[in-house]
Amino acid sequence: MKNLIAELLLKLAQKEEESKELCAQVEALEIIVTAMLRNMAQNDQQRLIEQVEGALYEVKPDASIPDDDTELLRNYVKKLLKHPRQ
């Protein structure tokens, strides 16, 4: 029983570490996208936003991906492009 608990705690710690790493990657990408958008001319910025939105619109999600997940991704991309980090 102790071995099982120790094994589960180890797996939990590994998952937490993976989660932290993914969060750091997302934060880094947000910072980069924000910096790029801020340094673009307004018309270039708008063109990029339209291209990304167009690409998202054309993508047909896999049937195994829940609609909620797809909508979450679309909303997050929209938020990042239209309201970059402060």
UniProtKB/Swiss-Prot annotation:
Localization, UniProt: Cytoplasm
UniProt entry keywords in alphabetical sequence: Coiled coil, Cytoplasm, Stress response
InterPro entries given in the database record: SigmaS_Anti-adapt_IraP
Main location: cytoplasm
A GO biological process held by the record: cellular response to starvation
Pfam family, one: Anti-adapt_IraP
Coiled coil: 1-36
Domain of life: Bacteria
GO CC terms in record: cytoplasm
Subunit structure: Interacts with RssB.
Function: Inhibits RpoS proteolysis by regulating RssB activity, thereby increasing the stability of the sigma stress factor RpoS especially during phosphate starvation, but also in stationary phase and during nitrogen starvation. Its effect on RpoS stability is due to its interaction with RssB, which probably blocks the interaction of RssB with RpoS, and the consequent delivery of the RssB-RpoS complex to the ClpXP protein degradation pathway.
Sequence similarity: Belongs to the IraP family.
Name of the protein in question: Anti-adapter protein IraP
Organism listed in the record: Shigella boydii serotype 4 (strain Sb227)
Gene: iraP
